[in-house]
Amino acid sequence: MRAVLTWRDKAEHCINDIAFKPDGTQLILAAGSRLLVYDTSDGTLLQPLKGHKDTVYCVAYAKDGKRFASGSADKSVIIWTSKLEGILKYTHNDAIQCVSYNPITHQLASCSSSDFGLWSPEQKSVSKHKSSSKIICCSWTNDGQYLALGMFNGIISIRNKNGEEKVKIERPGGSLSPIWSICWNPSSRWESFWMNRENEDAEDVIVNRYIQEIPSTLKSAVYSSQGSEAEEEEPEEEDDSPRDDNLEERNDILAVADWGQKVSFYQLSGKQIGKDRALNFDPCCISYFTKGEYILLGGSDKQVSLFTKDGVRLGTVGEQNSWVWTCQAKPDSNYVVVGCQDGTISFYQLIFSTVHGLYKDRYAYRDSMTDVIVQHLITEQKVRIKCKELVKKIAIYRNRLAIQLPEKILIYELYSEDLSDMHYRVKEKIIKKFECNLLVVCANHIILCQEKRLQCLSFSGVKEREWQMESLIRYIKVIGGPPGREGLLVGLKNGQILKIFVDNLFAIVLLKQATAVRCLDMSASRKKLAVVDENDTCLVYDIDTKELLFQEPNANSVAWNTQCEDMLCFSGGGYLNIKASTFPVHRQKLQGFVVGYNGSKIFCLHVFSISAVEVPQSAPMYQYLDRKLFKEAYQIACLGVTDTDWRELAMEALEGLDFETAKKAFIRVQDLRYLELISSIEERKKRGETNNDLFLADVFSYQGKFHEAAKLYKRSGHENLALEMYTDLCMFEYAKDFLGSGDPKETKMLITKQADWARNIKEPKAAVEMYISAGEHVKAIEICGDHGWVDMLIDIARKLDKAEREPLLLCATYLKKLDSPGYAAETYLKMGDLKSLVQLHVETQRWDEAFALGEKHPEFKDDIYMPYAQWLAENDRFEEAQKAFHKAGRQREAVQVLEQLTNNAVAESRFNDAAYYYWMLSMQCLDIAQDPAQKDTMLGKFYHFQRLAELYHGYHAIHRHTEDPFSVHRPETLFNISRFLLHSLPKDTPSGISKVKILFTLAKQSKALGAYRLARHAYDKLRGLYIPARFQKSIELGTLTIRAKPFHDSEELVPLCYRCSTNNPLLNNLGNVCINCRQPFIFSASSYDVLHLVEFYLEEGITDEEAISLIDLEVLRPKRDDRQLEIANNSSQILRLVETKDSIGDEDPFTAKLSFEQGGSEFVPVVVSRLVLRSMSRRDVLIKRWPPPLRWQYFRSLLPDASITMCPSCFQMFHSEDYELLVLQHGCCPYCRRCKDDPGP
């Protein structure tokens, strides 16, 4: 840093205070009793302002630039406009010591010896507050919320906008350390910078990629570049990056200068940050730069010093002849103004020089004057090293980093050999003050440049070697070498260029030119030397011959490519110039200085930052390609070119028959197609092919240069390849030129290819015609089939010979797919493929044609009826499916289908369907029972399934009643059903049937109908069962309420036995039979009332046909005096009507038979003779005409006037009116689902 005096002036009186206009164009000085207004650009006094009667002590400008204020010993404050006009004046009781504008609200604080006042343009009066001591200085926080007051008694008082004290800070010196100047830091992102600094020495630095500070205790300690993000700043941000306002409100830092000759820093809360810093003089003024990065401090030492924001002294801005009472930095610039006791006004420009070092991809530079940032140009990683002292010089080489501080040199090393490692640690310290122009570091040495002299020092500070030059040294660069024996390239002002080895006392003169050296670089192989002289000319020499190879103008820096011997770049005049070998220079716009060139990356320094610019090497590559230097062009391309450039290189090399280079280039762009071509050419070369025309023809054909390829094919004697190429390309007009002399195979091939082309370009009809003419019927059929051209398909099928089975079969397949079964059948018949014809009928469900074909060819019976049966089953036509299964002889499959349907219905609680399927199963078993071998087994299953069908049919109503919110059945019906189920359930309850639901329904309906005894019995039974939660409450309530009912059942509900006229109890232990005569009750399949029917049996020897014929005879009723006879034996008791010659009378023999009282506990069936049968009326008899092997069942109605209907299919009994209603509702029998119009069995 150095300060340049811009202008200076001298006033008659002491300069007490200074204020800049916010835009920096004007400067307001408090001198004597006047205000002096200066133009900052040239120091011209614009206007003196008069208004005060005594010395003006202070002046302040509002942030909006509209007003400024001045305070004087005359106890008054004057408000001035930016047009230098006074607009307001108010007074205090004492002299005004300081004034300050709120940066946000523009409220003015004015402080005197005894009080301070707050004024704003919106207020008419000034609010004043008393002070315990004389106020010397004041300052607002960045957000304008708090005002800090510095007092003569050493106290700092922090007040809010209303003047109320919030924080009080007492300095150790008390009244012996008056607070002479205070200032809030405009930047607030550095608070954590101070947190761990109290016990740190200057040389113990903190290295952290993310600017997190960790104390260092040992010289050999390792500092990691990994860490958490710090609060004050990001590693990549510079000081001029945007601030976070919210963070600023929390972390305002107050700098305090007192006459205890100390500088200290405080947080807004009053907590001190770090230790006090001794000054050794009385400070009179302290102020920050606009962005808070530096502090200006002046006082009794008669100079202004520049400090870092943490209080580290950096240097002197300007020395004066008297005390410095005020100093300020011009807003947003590096200009500083100083006001002195003797009236001197000095205006300085601060110039911050760039201190940096570069080695390959590592760049180190100074930041904030006391920090060093090392940047990895490839990975963009950064690490900050905090030195806490002014950084004077930086040098970097391989894993070494040297930093020169005012009193020492620190040498760092990388922790590991990893190329991307950013872990630095202190290796050595040279505690000695050095003055040098340039600093260079090697593996084990430090090189100092002092004008004409070079000194080589070890890391311990011992001078090992010294070189004295003839002229001033202008440039030094380490060019590498073994550790301890590195070579240096030195350029002198007299044009001499030398090479010096660290371990050699003698310098080697490489060459000497007429002009002074500005920049140097040596090529990777050390055979060429590039020099930039003071005339901005880049000169390139051959080191061995000292010959000037070429020179280029407009250069200020130069760098050789570290990966390519013949490439260099230089910058100048706002352009970047890239030169390859002796080719012309390629130029592009670029600001800055070239400092390195590695592959395709050019490192450019612009102002204070360095950046890696990715520069495609396309231009030099094409220069090599123009001269057919493919291998050299490939080397250039490896440095970095676009994919398009790689492809161009590959194509050029391929046409130049440089297959090796072309192969490498195509690998780069991953073009497998061309790689296969090159591979095939290499294989052919290995087999001895040497015809380059043929190779080049293949290349041209791949590149799309077909006519050139055809000419080369023809020239090389391979016309067939040209024909094949044009055919594949569908360029048939050109292909005909290469046809042989009427070769039918080639002609057919050409037509086929043309048809393929027509097919691909969506001309299918033309393609079909071409395929037919070429004899490719299969392909023609495929096109017709894909486009649904049925007419063309059948036309082709009819023209084909029946021996051509493959195209005919394909035709039939497409016709079937296109829903033209008639044409498909015609094709199958032409082929004689009857099995496929049967399959066609089955798949298209043309059952009539299939059955007709099956009649003619019985061998296809299974192929027809099995699919038919499955189709019927899928369409819920189970009766027909069963017949089909039977017809196919697949009884087991029929039973399996029904069993599966039944199980599914039970599992899904579809009990009505389950009953229907069980009935069908029973009828299936009855049909199978006709086989004598399976008769007994099947009859057992028949009765079992019949019983299950009856149970599930009844339980369906119970289930719906308990699950649905509304019931469609009358209470009497639900009562009868639940009684029927309770008496009928076997010991093992069938799957899906719930005893709880049956008993719950029985209890509920019994209670409703007056059968209280039966209801109590049902509730008692329920207590022994597991009750679902949803029934629990109802059952508990019913159990309690039934106790209040009488313990008997209503007589109206008691069932009557129509054989013996006995009243049976509602709860019958014997089941659904009479307790007296054991006659089974016959129930209605809808209401489950006991029907007035009695089953009777035929005497032995009477066949079913004879019985029917006897019943159909209409005879007179027998007379009342006919006798009834009883024949008894030891084994059984049989009631028989004896036929005598006088037996015909008025009394009905059957009725008389039923009224006979029998004894014993065994059931005695009613057996009738021919006479009794003859006496019966056909209207009173119901017959269940079971198919064999079962016998028919006969039932006699005892109340002929009450009509009963029996379903002719399932033989279930109904009240006639119930049956008719149900058939009207459902259109079929509710039990077996036989439709009304279906014929009987």
From Swiss-Prot:
Subcellular location field: Cell projection, Cilium; Cytoplasm, Cytoskeleton, Cilium basal body
Comp. bias regions, Acidic residues: 229-242
Function description: As a component of the IFT complex A (IFT-A), a complex required for retrograde ciliary transport and entry into cilia of G protein-coupled receptors (GPCRs), it is required in ciliogenesis and ciliary protein trafficking. Involved in cilia formation during neuronal patterning. Acts as a negative regulator of Shh signaling. Required to recruit TULP3 to primary cilia.
Source organism, top-level taxon: Eukaryota
Free-text comment on this protein's domains from its UniProt entry: Forms the trimeric core subcomplex IFT122:IFT140:WDR19 via the C-terminal region, whereas it interacts with IFT43:WDR35 via the N-terminal region containing the WD repeats.
UniProt gene name: IFT122
Subunit: Component of the IFT complex A (IFT-A) complex. IFT-A complex is divided into a core subcomplex composed of IFT122:IFT140:WDR19 which is associated with TULP3 and a peripheral subcomplex composed of IFT43:WDR35:TTC21B. Interacts with IFT43:WDR35; the interaction connects the 2 IFT-A subcomplexes. Interacts with IFTAP; the interaction associates IFTAP with IFT-A complex.
Protein name: Intraflagellar transport protein 122 homolog
A Pfam family: TPR_IFT122
SUPFAM superfamilies: WD40 repeat-like
Keywords linked to the UniProt accession: Cell projection, Ciliopathy, Cilium, Cilium biogenesis/degradation, Cytoplasm, Cytoskeleton, Developmental protein, Disease variant, Ectodermal dysplasia, Repeat, WD repeat
Phenotypic consequence of residue 570 to C: In CED1; uncertain significance
Chief site of localization: other
Tissue specificity annotation: Expressed in many tissues. Predominant expression in testis and pituitary.
Gene3D superfamilies associated with the record: 1.25.40.470, YVTN repeat-like/Quinoprotein amine dehydrogenase (2.130.10.10)
